[in-house]
Amino acid sequence: CTYFLTNGSTSGVIASVLACTNKGDKVLLWRNSHPSHLNAVKLAGCEPVFYNLPLNKEWGIPNKTTPDLIDVKGIKAVIVTSPSYEGIISDIKELKDICKKNGAFLIVDEAHGALYPFSDELPQSAVNIADFTIQSLHKTAGGLNPTALLHINCDINASKAISMIN
């Protein structure tokens, strides 16, 4: 199900983390992730576990998430930004498979990918793959500030996630 958010994608990240974790759970996030990711983890009383993205030596920017380097054992949720600020796309399907195998939720901050579902010429969207996908309509889709979407694609009670931000 999909919900419109009027407090930006940050509220979607917070709702997602609060909905799928409990106090003391471990949440994996990128070392260079948006501040809202760490804030959501702290708000939930969870323990952040940081993942350092490998660097693309040619461009000097963080590369995509490398699933073979991610250890999700004991992790309750994984937060990924795709596309990244540099436009790097991670393999969301592969990440979801790893998370599912280890009982972790996958939260994708797709703030800059709101238009992905509308063209086969664009990268595949996380909307139908990840457990939670957050998109910012105001960044790439012409929405008013701070319009965003929260897509929930798991067995979590959606009303629990929404009650966290209402």
Give residue ranges: language-model regions.
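Conserved PLP-enzyme active-site core in the AAT-like
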Residues: N7-N166
